């Protein structure tokens, strides 16, 4: 089978009415799956449905009550939800429009042309154009293709992985990466103040300012997710339930719904909120705050009639030079014990990967004991 045939886009374009069994989710997951468009319409029509908080952070730039209210609103959302719709983010609409247009133009190219940027996870090359071909802990594949690469700092990026076509892709991605880096600092300041800490605390901890000789910048990884039309959205997912390893994740989309977050024991569909971007709290920030801010469990659904694209920027600490552990000031009164052992970001990623592999082995063993075939 060629690389082109392995892409989910090719499978979708083939006109299949059923999906291969490797994409069919385990039976226990299917009860609340469905078409992303239909679930979003139902959520919008039901005022009683839980709604992800919307916070305008432009008030943070002012003194007085507005600034304090902004900090409190972000704090509450990060503690109770782990996800926020951010308005007043300062990202110009024309930049976001150009970014979306460039990503859509890349994924509109023939698959064979996109293959020039193909990654090779088996060889350790994670960046580039790819599909989630390796089975997850569930033993199933995800209904998505993607483009993934470092977008900031620019001097560390491998620009050979940035598409030359469309020509706009490189300049607008570079511009966007720099702007999100500025936004990340602002949000980390707000989140620090929400904990009663000096506003530079969380960023200093993520960049290693507390360690002698260490002052690395945060790394921003851009992933464009492409979710093709799926004939059976009641059986498949674009991205299975997970938390992000990052400190913060920033999400834009093409207007097609699909994001769901887990809150108060159930899945909540993210409603369209014009003019906002979605921000997730990730594992690294949950560790630093000793669980005060919640790394949100989320997933991506697919649709029978619409293609969904999302642009996700993962804001991460340097992989090995920074030790992630709860901020000491949050433990100072002795009332709280550290919930997380110290680890580097690289160690945390490896730990999550090991746990997934162990889950896969346990699932395989259980299936084998029941006389089922395993992959």
Swiss-Prot record:
Gene3D superfamilies: B-lactam Antibiotic, Isopenicillin N Synthase, Chain
Cofactor binding summary note: Binds 1 ascorbate molecule per subunit.
GO biological process, alphabetically ordered: anthocyanin-containing compound biosynthetic process
Keywords from the named record: Dioxygenase, Flavonoid biosynthesis, Iron, Metal-binding, Oxidoreductase, Vitamin C
This protein's pathway: Pigment biosynthesis; anthocyanin biosynthesis
Top-tier EC class: oxidoreductase
A Pfam family hit: DIOX_N
Induction cue: Induced by light.
Fe2OG dioxygenase domain: residues covered: 218-317
Function: Involved in anthocyanin and protoanthocyanidin biosynthesis by catalyzing the oxidation of leucoanthocyanidins into anthocyanidins.
Protein name: Leucoanthocyanidin dioxygenase 1
Organism: Oryza sativa subsp. japonica
Gene behind the chain: ANS1
């Amino acid at each position: 089978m060629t690389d082109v045939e392995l892409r989910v886009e090719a499978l979708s374009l083939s006109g299949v009415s059923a999906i291969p069994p490797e994409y069919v989710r385990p039976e226990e997951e299917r009860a609340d799956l469905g078409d992303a468009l239909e679930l979003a319409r139902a959520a919008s029509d039901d005022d009683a449905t839980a709604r992800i908080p919307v916070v305008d952070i432009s008030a943070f730039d002012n003194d007085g009550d507005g600034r304090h209210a902004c900090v409190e609103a972000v704090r509450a959302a990060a503690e109770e939800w782990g996800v926020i719709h951010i308005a007043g983010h300062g990202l110009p609409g024309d930049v976001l429009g150009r970014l979306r247009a460039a990503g859509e133009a890349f994924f509109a190219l023939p698959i064979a042309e996109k293959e020039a940027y193909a990654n090779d996870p088996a060889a350790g090359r994670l960046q580039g154009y790819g599909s989630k071909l390796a089975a997850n802990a569930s033993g199933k594949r995800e209904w998505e293709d993607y483009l993934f690469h470092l977008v900031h700092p620019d001097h560390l990026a491998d620009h050979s992985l940035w598409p030359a076509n469309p020509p706009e892709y490189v300049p607008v991605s570079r511009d966007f990466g720099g702007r999100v880096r500025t936004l990340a600092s602002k949000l980390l300041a707000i989140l620090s103040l929400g904990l009663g800490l000096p506003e530079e605390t969380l960023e200093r901890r993520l960049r290693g300012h507390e360690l002698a000789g260490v002052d690395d910048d945060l790394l921003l990884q851009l992933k464009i997710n492409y979710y093709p039309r799926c004939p059976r959205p009641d059986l498949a997912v674009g991205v299975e339930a997970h938390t992000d390893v990052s400190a913060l994740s920033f999400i834009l989309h093409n207007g097609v719904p699909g994001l769901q977050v887990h809150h108060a024991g159930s899945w909540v569909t993210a409603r369209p909120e014009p003019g906002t971007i979605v921000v997730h709290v990730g594992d690294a920030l949950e560790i630093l705050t000793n669980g005060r801010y919640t790394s949100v469990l989320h997933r991506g659904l697919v649709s029978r009639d619409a293609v969904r694209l999302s642009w996700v920027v993962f804001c991460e600490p340097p992989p090995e030079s920074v030790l992630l552990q709860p901020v000491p000031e949050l433990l100072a009164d002795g009332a709280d014990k550290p919930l997380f052992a110290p680890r580097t970001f690289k160690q945390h990623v490896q730990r999550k990967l090991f746990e997934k592999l162990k889950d896969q082995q346990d699932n395989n063993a259980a299936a084998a004991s029941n006389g089922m075939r395993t992959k």
